[in-house]
Amino acid sequence: MALASGCTLSNTPRRSLAELRTALLNHDADTAFRYVDVDSIVRCMVRDIFAKYESKADDPLMILGIKAGREAAGLLMPAVAELARNRVRAAILSPDEGGYFEYVQKGSVWYLDIATDGKTAVVNPIGKPETKFRMRQMEDGHWKIVEIMRE
């Protein structure tokens, strides 16, 4: 059995997260984006925001406003995703004076609870129940973060 990247098995979520950690610490944005789907994360965040408002909408005008907002968000999504990608790339390439990756520097892929179901995994840093994210396995076998899940 092949072992790599600090004794993590290849083609596992943990291995992809170890590769992502290395890319972030090396300020290697291109490699980091191999393991993070910013477009999908932004789409999921927008979806969740509208779902939250829809669950609280109780008058027709509010429902109409939410529907209009959802349509506008759909039209703006490519520009928003590009802006998010550019900001993430800038953060990765920066000397990290803002402390973006302080948790990554201190962390280890072994402090993650990873529940895999087929080609999907839910990852939860141990001791941080409010922080979860979903990963999907790509065609070539590596895993990519596709959604940040908030309780």
Annotate each PLM feature.
Residues 3-6:
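C-terminal motif of bacterial Sec signal peptides marking the signal peptidase cleavage site
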Residues 39-57:
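Short, charge-rich amphipathic alpha-helical segments embedded
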Residues 12-27:
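Short, aromatic-enriched amphipathic alpha-helices that serve as compact interaction elements
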Residues 23, 35, 52, 83, ...:
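Residues that form generic nucleotide/phosphate-binding pockets
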Residues 8-10:
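Bacterial signal peptide processing site
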Residues 29-39:
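Short, well-ordered alpha-helical segments enriched in acidic and aromatic residues
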Residues 56-77:
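Long, compositionally biased
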Residues 74-151:
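Exposed beta-sheet edge and beta->alpha loop/turn motif
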